[in-house]
Amino acid sequence: MRTVWQHCHVATMAEGRYSAIEDAAIVTSAGLIEWIGPRAELAPVDADRTVDLGGAWITPGLIDCHTHAVFGGNRSGEFEQRLQGVSYAEIAAQGGGIASTVRATRAASEDELFASARQRVQALMRDGVTTLEIKSGYGLDLANERKMLRVARRLADELPLAVRATCLAAHALPPEYAGRADDYIAHICDEMLPALAAEGLVDAVDAFCEHLAFSPAQVERLFIKARELGLPVKLHAEQLSSLHGSSLAARYQALSADHLEFMTEEDAIAMAAAGTVAVLLPGAFYFLRETQLPPMDALRRHGVKIALASDLNPGTSPGLSLRLMLNMGCTCFRMTPEEALAGVTVHAATALGLGDSHGSLEVGKVADFVAWQIERPADLAYWLGGDLPKRVVRKGHEISN
């Protein structure tokens, strides 16, 4: 079906800029953008439908490129404990922290995980998200990692959005491998990844590179295996310390390196050369009350593409609003509103390997876009909450009005 969408203003986000078109029109057909430009330049179109957008601003559909949306349990009690002065180490000693989420996720059925994740994902969708990434990493064995990744695939099948599934089996050390990190990495490489990839459940491979998780050498073994399987890689890096994980990610042409509060200029240079996207996660920075800022000047100076994401997870960023992350990116990390919007559209698409098809409003790309009743694009980063999108369009069809 061919549809003409008109009486609107468009922030195309081409090349990471607003690239605004005033009094614009968009023609969509077969789920793609067939034409976009000033309405006055639109030639007569044999359209099945014409939609008046009432002067709304149009942006690409928002893309949340880093989430842990599938998990069992609830850790709000730990939040209360931390506010009362209980340390993370004490909480962990009591059986809390990520270990509690692993236990709850292992105990939950696939249907239970799907039902809870569906609610969280629908909250993101109401905020204008049309594409998101979902990581595993709370199962930490083959059966439970498979269960989480199956939920991610089901969400894509049953909801009108695109989902990229990332295997994060190297998220933490499971209790049955206590003190045997090398053995666990070998198990992931020899057993888990080949099986999950063969089942078509994995779009990318991720790991957590930190002193409290996995070393660069262990991560490199995982990356080598991912490359053998034809899977792109990503990395949680430099969140708590500098291990130059982001440089390691760049050596393997990673789609992205994420967090990056402690990255160095050397890391930024390596990422720029490799085309690896820097995914910043202000929700975790805010929730954990961190003080070390990502090196924004170095990222800009070397031309590293910068994305923003919610990092939705039960322990460090229980954030259900990607629009709130726009504001946090500006207030916490000193991004401009234009940089922040690029971070949840065109650069987020690149961080998922979707840069050729998603993330900006250009001819030939997927017709995912959002209509906002705002005065200017910067309003999306300026307002804390407020009205939901006026319309959300996925592959040229309205999914919310």
Swiss-Prot record:
Fe(3+) binds at residues 66, 68, 236, 311. One of its GO terms (molecular function) is imidazolonepropionase activity. Transmembrane segments: none annotated. Pathway: Amino-acid degradation; L-histidine degradation into L-glutamate; N-formimidoyl-L-glutamate from L-histidine: step 3/3. InterPro entries: Amidohydro-rel (IPR006680), HutI (IPR005920), Metal-dep_hydrolase_composite (IPR011059), Metal_Hydrolase (IPR032466). Keywords: Cytoplasm, Histidine metabolism, Hydrolase, Iron, Metal-binding, Zinc. Binds 1 zinc or iron ion per subunit. 4-imidazolone-5-propanoate binds at residues 75, 138, 171, 239, 316. Zn(2+) binds at residues 66, 68, 236, 311. GO terms for biological process: L-histidine catabolic process to glutamate and formamide; L-histidine catabolic process to glutamate and formate. It catalyses: 4-imidazolone-5-propanoate + H2O = N-formimidoyl-L-glutamate. GO terms for cellular component: cytoplasm. Its cofactor is Zn(2+); Fe(3+). N-formimidoyl-L-glutamate binds at residues 138, 313, 315. Its EC number is 3.5.2.7. It is found in: Cytoplasm. Catalyzes the hydrolytic cleavage of the carbon-nitrogen bond in imidazolone-5-propanoate to yield N-formimidoyl-L-glutamate. It is the third step in the universal histidine degradation pathway. HAMAP family: HutI (MF_00372). Belongs to the metallo-dependent hydrolases superfamily. HutI family. This is Imidazolonepropionase. It comes from Pseudomonas putida.
